[in-house]
Regions:
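Active-site acidic/histidine clusters and adjacent loop/turn architecture
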Residues: 97-101, 105-207
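One face of beta-strands
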Residues: 64, 75, 102, 172, ...
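Surface-exposed, glycine/proline- and aromatic-rich loop segments on solvent-exposed faces
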Residues: 75-108
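Short, Gly/Pro- and small/polar-rich lid/capping loops
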Residues: 36-63
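N-terminal secretory signal peptides
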Residues: 1-12, 19-24, 28
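Short Pro/Gly-enriched beta-strand edge/turn motifs at strand-loop
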Residues: 43-50, 87, 192-198
Length: 219
């Protein structure tokens, strides 16, 4: 379907700096063939900003709202990594041992319209990768990266995230700076999802990030 109304023409707008919400990393699942609960452990950063390939499912996501040209917009960016249990013993470099997915969207609040796009690829070959050292995720032409900006700042202001997203009807080039400490969900980062102890994930968030950059809408 062709876009209509305010999204009919590709336009680029400067985002007014303001706080947004960020839930940066979650990891769920366990090693193949087990039903054990995830062990409680102290999360360590920046290592735990990165990927954990021994876990079955992992995700990094950003949600927020901005003002651009005096108009409100919402946005969502999510990257997933999924371990494929059945291919872990294969020796071929082409074996799809991990899959990366991504989904992104912009909400035109005034125009009451949602536009979105997605990507998927197997990890490797420079096409899709998720670093274990820190948040550095690439899926084709979409990226999400974290860098340390502590230089003389308090600990809670130590993170800067950047993302580059180009969809069929929109684009996002945004920078997010932390304004408060990491928030550990559940019991020091181990978040129960149900009555069974195995129904849990490691989960933390960084809310109230200050955001700046540009967004594009239209095709």
């Amino acid at each position: 379907a062709q876009p209509s109304g305010p999204l009919a023409t590709r336009r680029q707008w400067l985002v007014t700096q303001m706080p947004v919400g960020l839930a940066a990393v979650g990891a769920a699942g366990w090693l193949p063939g087990t039903a054990h609960a995830l062990p409680a452990r102290a999360l360590s950063f920046p290592r735990d900003h990165g990927s954990h390939p021994e876990l079955r499912t992992e995700w990094w996501y950003i949600t927020g709202h901005v003002q651009a040209q005096g108009q409100p917009w919402g946005f969502q960016i999510t990257f997933f990594r999924s371990r494929v249990d059945g291919t872990q013993q294969l020796q071929s470099a082409f074996a799809a041992k991990h899959l990366l997915f991504a989904h992104a969207a912009i909400t035109d609040v005034r125009g009451q319209r949602l536009v979105h796009d997605q990507r998927i690829a197997r990890a490797g070959f420079g096409v899709a990768q998720a670093s274990e050292a820190d948040t550095r995720i690439r899926l084709q032409d979409w990226t999400l990266e974290r860098s340390d900006t502590a230089r003389g700042k308090p600990d809670f202001a130590a993170s800067r995230y950047t993302t580059h997203i180009v969809g069929s009807e929109f684009g996002l080039d945004l920078v997010f700076d932390s304004t408060q400490p990491v928030l550990l969900q559940g019991q020091q980062g181990l978040s129960r999802k149900g009555p069974d102890a195995a129904q849990a994930s490691y989960y933390y968030s960084q809310p109230q990030l200050a955001v700046s950059g540009t967004l594009q809408v239209g095709n």
